[in-house]
Amino acid sequence: MTDNSNIRVVVGMSGGVDSSVTALLLKEQGYDVIGVFMKNWDDTDEFGVCTATEDYKDVAAVADQIGIPYYSVNFEKEYWDRVFEYFLAEYRAGRTPNPDVMCNKEIKFKAFLDYAMTLGADYVATGHYAQVTRDENGIVHMLRGADNNKDQTYFLSQLSQEQLQKTLFPLGHLQKPEVRRIAEEAGLATAKKKDSTGICFIGEKNFKDFLGQYLPAQPGRMMTVDGRDMGEHAGLMYYTIGQRGGLGIGGQHGGDNKPWFVVGKDLSKNILYVGQGFYHDSLMSTSLTASEIHFTRDMPNEFKLECTAKFRYRQPDSKVKVYVKGNQARVVFDDLQRAITPGQAVVFYNEQECLGGGMIDQAYRDDKICQYI
């Protein structure tokens, strides 16, 4: 058995079951393990209750159970500057941001990694469902997690080779039920704790109310693509491309009783475009452009790639051709794609390997910009 006792791994512990089992497995494998809780947001509610305090208590309980030291580090300023400001700027621009991608890139694998190095870390580890493997040249490849339902490579697609070189994902080969079972068999304090969902800084709060605290809503007209007025929208930032609920128009405008969907936004005129039918023509596109293109290892400045891609989390892969130039790319789909959403991540795969990705700027139908921003 390999002696890992001289290898220090600093584990990002959230107070959830996944990061708890991550720390446990590394400890069992003989590593020198330290647990660190990141406080990224002041989430004290109107009753003075802070969920981060409860989560930190869970981290402390688990760390004590498995016998590792633990610390808390405050990244509220870094999170505000690098993630939350981006989140607001994207909504101001009428886009739908993906703060999880930015949080991994800027906080969990940058601010946290830097902090871990001050603790003498050889590696950091998190409870993400992804895998890393090293080839004979020492290049690290990131592979999908074995649990298809939980694979999180979509959110990790902006990680660099330097970040991946320093990262372990001990849960990558496990299915989620196995992780729960390991926690229960070890009697961990978090074994039965439910998974957190949604955006960390919103938590259980109403999204509309939350966003309205930071950005003034600007109501405007809701129109069909052919110019029919369908009433008022509450503010473009509250709607995303392909959204069905929350439009308040139902079937009262005649037609064929098909459900209504958001099919586009005109930011300059503050118009929300809606259309009937899941596969409404305005929702379908043949290609997209993306920026902030990034690969997990060094690539030429300009090249063409045939691979598969995801345009949202948990979506089946689609075959694409990618034309890369610097940090920009044009992605052409083999088949029509629905509801390509500016602001979301496009992520590239070669079978099991996550190659990298970028942020969607615009969708196209042939060479015509779709009815979006």
From Swiss-Prot:
Cellular localisation: Cytoplasm
EC number: 2.8.1.13
Catalytic reaction list: S-sulfanyl-L-cysteinyl-[protein] + uridine(34) in tRNA + AH2 + ATP = 2-thiouridine(34) in tRNA + L-cysteinyl-[protein] + A + AMP + diphosphate + H(+)
Annotated binding of ATP, by residue: 12-19, 38, 127
Region (Interaction with tRNA): 150-152, 312-313
Stretch list, region Interaction with target base in tRNA: 98-100
GO cellular component: cytoplasm
NCBIfam families from the UniProt entry: PRK00143.1, trmU
Signal peptide: none
Alphabetic keyword roster: ATP-binding, Cytoplasm, Disulfide bond, Nucleotide-binding, RNA-binding, Transferase, tRNA processing, tRNA-binding
Molecular function terms from GO: ATP binding; tRNA binding; tRNA-uridine 2-sulfurtransferase activity
SUPFAM superfamilies the UniProt entry points to: Adenine nucleotide alpha hydrolases-like (SSF52402)
Enzyme superclass (EC): transferase
Keyword Transferase listed: yes
Residue positions of the active site: 103 (nucleophile), 200 (cysteine persulfide intermediate)
Species the sequence originates in: Streptococcus agalactiae serotype Ia (strain ATCC 27591 / A909 / CDC SS700)
Protein name: tRNA-specific 2-thiouridylase MnmA
Disulfide bonds: 103-200
InterPro entries: MnmA-like, MnmA-like_C, MnmA-like_central, MnmA-like_central_sf, Rossmann-like_a/b/a_fold
Role according to the record: Catalyzes the 2-thiolation of uridine at the wobble position (U34) of tRNA, leading to the formation of s(2)U34.
One Gene Ontology term from the biological process aspect of the record: tRNA wobble position uridine thiolation
Family, as annotated: Belongs to the MnmA/TRMU family.
